[in-house]
């Protein structure tokens, strides 16, 4: 069984299955098969003792890994990259954004929270090149304190909430990040 899983992972079968299912769900929901918008976020997850590539997220005070995700406007996963929790969100976003630019023709706008503001926006514009795609920072409303739902951002938060409900994804115990990426898909 493990040999099949490993072989399919190496051959990209899992990613192709996910891609096909996502397209079918989008079409069934009345959308085009390619997303026109996407949302970026990250989530720090505790790891087991034997997990490698873990780090310490000083902001959240958690030892573990960080899951960088991009979802479409239905909350369906487009790309997931798992790395050490010590990587800043702006730095960890680069590979996942690059994967979205390479893997999808559709997104014209990608929304992100203010943690991604700054040099990442200029870097993204350079990577997008002539393609009509922008990284838009969704800022908190001024004068509003406490929790407040931000436009588009709630979609990625809902998806991350779904992922945490899975026993296998709530705390990563795998030795390598690759199976964790695959489990997220």
Which sequence ranges carry the predicted segments?
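Short alpha-helical elements
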Residues: 1-185
């Amino acid at each position: 069984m493990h040999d099949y899983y490993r072989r399919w992972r190496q051959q990209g079968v899992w990613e192709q299955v996910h891609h096909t299912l996502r397209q079918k769900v989008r079409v069934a929901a009345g959308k085009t098969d390619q997303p026109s918008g996407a949302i970026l976020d990250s989530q720090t997850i505790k790891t087991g003792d034997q997990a490698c590539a873990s780090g310490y997220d000083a902001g959240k005070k958690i030892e573990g890994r960080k899951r960088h995700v991009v979802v479409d406007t239905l909350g369906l996963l487009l790309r997931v990259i798992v790395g050490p929790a010590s990587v800043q969100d702006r730095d960890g976003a680069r590979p996942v954004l690059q994967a979205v630019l390479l893997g999808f023709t559709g997104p014209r706008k990608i929304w992100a929270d203010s943690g991604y503001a700054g040099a990442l926006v200029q870097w993204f514009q350079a990577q997008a090149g002539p393609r009509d795609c922008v990284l838009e920072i969704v800022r908190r409303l001024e004068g509003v304190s406490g929790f407040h739902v931000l436009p588009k951002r709630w979609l990625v938060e809902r998806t991350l909430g779904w992922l945490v409900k899975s026993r296998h994804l709530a705390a990563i115990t795998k030795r390598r990040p690759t199976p964790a990426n695959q489990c997220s898909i």
